[in-house]
Amino acid sequence: MITEVKHIGITPLHPKEDFLKKVENFFEGVKKALIIRLDEAFYTQDLLEKIENSSKKSNSIVIYNSRNDIGSKKNIHLTSIDLMNYKGKRECNFLLGASCHNQNEVEKANQLKCDYILISPVLKDKHGNKEIGWKKFGELAKNFNGISYALGGVKIEDLSESINHGGTGISGISCFF
C-alpha cells in the first residue's frame, strides 16, 4: 500500500549511465515508490522491465507518469495539467496520484479519488520556482482526502518536517538520484 511509503522518487528525464544502479540502491531497504518520468528517448520496454524487476526485491511500487503513459492497467501519476484535463474512469485496482500546486488542483484530485498527491514546490528548488512553504503545504495536505508528499527543494532530512505538517513523506528527483 502507498500509505506505507515515506519516500517517492522521481526518475530524471535524462538518466545517466549509472541510472540502473541508482534505481537498485533506491529500492534497497524499506518499501518505496518510484515515478517513472523519462524523456521519450529513454522510455524503452527494456528499461521499464529492469526498473520493475528492481522494485520487486523490496516490494516497492512503480508508478508511471502521465507525460509518458496513461494506460488503464498501471499505477499512474498525473501531471497537474493532465489532472485538470483528466476525463478517464478511475481504475480501482491501480494507484492514481497527482501533482498539485494549489487548492483547485487538490479539489480535482479529491474528485478523482486520487490515492496520493505531491504538493509542490514546498521549498525553493533548482528551477527557481516560488516556494509555497511548509505552512501552505500543511493547509493543502489537510484539504486532501488521501495522503500527501512534499516535493520541490526537499531533502531526505525534511521527512519529519513533512510529517509535522500533515504529510506522509517526501518526493523528489535530486534528493534520490
Regions from the PLM with identified roles:
Residues 26-89:
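N-terminal active-site wall of soluble small-molecule enzyme domains
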Residues 49-63, 83, 89-102, 130-153:
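Alpha-helix-loop-beta-strand connector modules within alpha/beta enzyme cores
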Residues 10-14, 39-41, 67, 81, ...:
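Active-site beta-loop-alpha junctions enriched in small/polar residues
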Residues 73-82, 94-139:
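Glycine/Thr-rich beta-alpha phosphate-binding loop at enzyme active sites
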Residues 1-22:
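N-terminal amphipathic alpha-helix/helix-capping segment at the start of soluble metabolic enzymes
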